[in-house]
Amino acid sequence: MLRVLGIESSCDETAAAVVEGAEHGHPHGVVVRSNVVWSQLEVHALYGGVVPELASRAHIRHIQPVIEQALAEAGVRPQQLDAIAVTVAPGLVGALLVGVAAAQGLAVALDKPLVPVHHMEGHLMSPFLMAGVVPAMEFPFVALLVSGGHTLLLHARDFGDYQLLGQTRDDAVGEAFDKGARMLGLGYPGGPEVAALAQSGDRQAVAFPRVLLDRSQFDFSFSGLKTALRTHLLKFPPESGGPSLADVAASYQEAIVDTLVIKSLSACRHVGVSRLVIAGGVGANRRLREKLAKQALKQGVQLYAPPIHLCTDNGAMIASAGVCRLARGDQARGVVNAVPRLPIHELEKIYGR
């Protein structure tokens, strides 16, 4: 049994977790012993988005207490760890460096292996951490990874074997929600704000575009949708008799959801798999999960939608990927650097390959 501490600090959550997994290194059977997350939401809400410098400072203040709490909740002494895993890419460079420095210090002090982990590979581990799911998660599958900084579709053929099917050409879906929320006069983060307002709105009130649906590839684009929202609000302001803000929010959210659902299920058909995973912060959107589940069922696709605490950034997913990487011998051979930009299909560069 491998016992791994995972550390995550790529953006605005300071997280650490302890997991245990089998030495064969398959994500099945990984048990989460603790999973501690300190959110910086209140730090950044005043600014309407993540401020990198403030994020780094908050990580510095909270990284050690979060690690100590994760160890305490797991009932594990540092010497009982087999390795320390840490997110090294991609993310805000200052934020990444805080986690990397903490992990390297621990690894040296304890004389334990340090395992670098790609953030998006961590998200791919989240469905394997769902207890009691029938049928159990297996490779291969298609993954829709959606967050403030990423929107992409992957064909995960096996652990470490990922084919990029499509990605956003401009804004990530989380950015589309944040910027849309700002236009609607809502707060940050935009996704939950838009979703809350949309609950009382008519999803068909405004005919917003679904972009790139008529093409065979799986890229996304949300810049045109944002422009359509801005144009609509200028032409038909709610205070002058236009559709209500709730109707506009519901229609805007539905356009985003439709695009993600149609592309994801089309990708499943394209590669011939019947398992679909959704992960990342936007994966917590209730309407997206609801519509994806309904359409997946119609098309004979099994949807794996992890609980919200596993969709958003957390240490358990990093520790789980760390177990698998450690079993493959993928550990640091020297000083580890933070890499702010690294596509998941190039993640082997982390391990010198």
Swiss-Prot record:
Residue numbers binding substrate: 145-149, 178, 191, 285
Enzyme class per UniProt: transferase
Keywords, ordered alphabetically: Acyltransferase, Cytoplasm, Iron, Metal-binding, Transferase, tRNA processing
GO cellular component: cytoplasm
Xref: CDD domains: ASKHA_NBD_TsaD_bac
UniProt-listed SUPFAM superfamilies: Actin-like ATPase domain
GO annotation terms (biological process): tRNA threonylcarbamoyladenosine modification
Source superkingdom: Bacteria
Record-linked InterPro entries: ATPase_NBD, Gcp-like_dom, KAE1/TsaD, TsaD
Residue pairs linked by disulfide bridges in the UniProt entry: none
Keyword flag Metal-binding: yes
Subcellular location: Cytoplasm
One Pfam family, short name: TsaD
Binding residues for Fe cation: 119, 123, 313
Catalytic reactions of this protein: L-threonylcarbamoyladenylate + adenosine(37) in tRNA = N(6)-L-threonylcarbamoyladenosine(37) in tRNA + AMP + H(+)
EC id: 2.3.1.234
One GO MF term attached to the UniProt entry: iron ion binding
Keyword Transmembrane helix: no
The protein's role, per its UniProt record: Required for the formation of a threonylcarbamoyl group on adenosine at position 37 (t(6)A37) in tRNAs that read codons beginning with adenine. Is involved in the transfer of the threonylcarbamoyl moiety of threonylcarbamoyl-AMP (TC-AMP) to the N6 group of A37, together with TsaE and TsaB. TsaD likely plays a direct catalytic role in this reaction.
Similarity comment text for this entry: Belongs to the KAE1 / TsaD family.
PANTHER family: TRNA N6-ADENOSINE THREONYLCARBAMOYLTRANSFERASE, TRNA N6-ADENOSINE THREONYLCARBAMOYLTRANSFERASE, MITOCHONDRIAL
Name of the protein described by the UniProt record: tRNA N6-adenosine threonylcarbamoyltransferase
Organism of this sequence: Magnetococcus marinus (strain ATCC BAA-1437 / JCM 17883 / MC-1)
Gene name per UniProt: tsaD
